[in-house]
């Protein structure tokens, strides 16, 4: 069933063909997940084809090898802080990040940490009345709304968040490691994970950055419209107020 929202690839030619098909269909971006399970030839073919078609490539960063390979392949942006409950990024990855961000000719390396979903889980678990807000119902049929509501009747039992109590304490350290490495951080959300909806997640990401991690508010504001428009190569149309 996953073929409806993610495509596996079987060889470099298949990778190129699928990226080209997506490009011809008008997508704005190519997203990698589990690319540490692809061959380097497959992954390189996909990245090269995306860039050939003017599309940025975003890569998951849940596992160390996803980051290493993404840096070697030249992806444009990483998503999530990743590495589960590990306390920090490995030294070799930090060295690779510093090497990449030092290359001004390649432009910025972007990173979208998506921290608020994990950071706010325990609060939401203990204050579930927030989920009564119906702003997330927009555009959904009643049957889907009912199904979603049933899915979080017992938020303390959701398997997705089992490791959150030991993952949350690692988020700020990893966030600061990335900032110190010189990546350009982007405001983005992981809307779609349990109890996280597009209608509320963005301001909560701002809140964690500024009020929990101490990011300057103006830097956080630029990380939402301006830098994402640069990463998406649409800054001539979006991203600034003038």
Model segments located where?
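His/Asp/Glu-enriched, well-ordered alpha-helical/loop segment
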Residues: 156-158, 168-242
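Active-site core of metal-dependent hydrolases
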Residues: 32-168, 193, 214, 232
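Active-site mouth loops of central-metabolism enzymes
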Residues: 1-17, 56-57
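Short acidic, glycine-rich surface-loop motifs adjacent to enzyme active sites
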Residues: 22-36, 190
């Amino acid at each position: 069933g996953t073929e409806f929202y993610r495509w596996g690839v079987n060889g470099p030619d298949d990778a190129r063909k699928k990226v080209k098909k997506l490009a011809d269909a008008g997508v704005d971006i190519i997203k990698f997940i589990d690319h540490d399970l692809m061959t380097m030839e497959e992954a390189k073919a996909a990245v090269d084809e995306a860039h050939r078609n003017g599309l940025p490539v975003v890569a998951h960063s849940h596992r160390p090898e996803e980051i290493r390979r993404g840096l070697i392949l030249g992806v444009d942006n990483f998503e999530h802080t990743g590495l589960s409950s590990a306390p920090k990024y490995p030294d070799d990855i930090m060295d690779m990040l510093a090497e990449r961000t030092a290359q001004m000719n390649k432009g910025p390396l972007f990173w979208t940490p998506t921290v608020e979903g994990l950071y706010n889980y325990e609060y939401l678990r203990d204050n579930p009345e927030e989920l009564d807000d119906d702003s997330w119902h927009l555009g959904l049929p009643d049957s889907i709304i009912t199904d979603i509501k049933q899915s979080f009747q017992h938020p303390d039992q959701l398997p997705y968040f089992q490791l959150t109590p030991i993952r949350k304490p690692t988020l700020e350290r990893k966030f600061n490691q990335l900032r110190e490495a010189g990546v350009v951080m982007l405001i983005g959300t992981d809307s779609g994970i349990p109890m996280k909806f597009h209608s509320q997640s963005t301001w909560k990401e701002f809140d964690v950055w500024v009020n929990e991690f101490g990011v300057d508010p103006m830097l956080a504001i630029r990380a939402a419209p301006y830098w994402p428009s640069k990463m998406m190569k649409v800054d001539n149309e979006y991203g600034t107020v003038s």
